């Protein structure tokens, strides 16, 4: 069992994955990662993400980064479980940018 992820390890994941992006990509965090980065709780068991657009290079980098940082990463977002809400991209909150990878909290309204 891997240890819970705190904000620093999630930010390290952001830096590591950002180094791999060869073009502009958006990554949306959902669930536990959002709760940790916003400060609602100290840790999470995994990081749920959505990439737009999906790129082979980032998908290939994920297993290596997951192992290096000893973390679980799931490709999951609310639009896989409920109908996509109109305007969700506009409501997604910008976190920061690492290289060519921009990080957002997936629309909190859709996560509720």
Positions of predicted regions on the chain:
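Compositionally biased terminal segments of proteins
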Residues: 1-112
